């Protein structure tokens, strides 16, 4: 690490990444995993979404939505819960492992936070 002129080291960087920012990163990456049809919001997210739609006339673009992802950032860790819908023909265990890996990597790469990612397969779409 390079020291600034004058011989003193730079102070450590202090920052906080909000829950919504992490949720959007996680949702965006989870949607790209082959076999993920959609993300599914839980009841609390559905109710908040309805309230937000009623209160805000401007809809949130699809790529910025975080439905189906719940996040709690605590210090340098993010607890991430992702709820996905898949389609028949994909192995649920393999899909969950891939989503877990991809979302964790995206959160680490983008925010610097360690992520504990839990995946729920909520439904399987039939042809």
Each language-model region and where it sits:
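Short amphipathic alpha-helical signal-transduction/dimerization elements
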Residues: 104-108
């Amino acid at each position: 690490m390079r020291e600034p002129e004058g011989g003193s080291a730079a102070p450590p960087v202090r920052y906080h990444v909000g829950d919504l920012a992490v949720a959007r990163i996680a949702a965006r990456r989870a949607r790209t995993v082959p076999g993920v049809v959609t993300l599914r919001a839980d009841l609390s997210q559905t109710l908040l979404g309805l309230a937000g739609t009623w209160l805000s006339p401007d809809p949130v673009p699809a790529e910025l939505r975080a439905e189906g992802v719940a996040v709690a950032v605590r210090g340098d860790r993010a607890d991430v819960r992702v709820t996905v819908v898949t389609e028949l023909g994909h192995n649920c265990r393999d899909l969950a492992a891939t989503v877990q890996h991809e979302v964790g990597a995206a959160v680490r790469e983008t925010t610097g936070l360690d992520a504990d990612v839990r995946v729920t397969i909520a439904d399987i779409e039939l042809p």
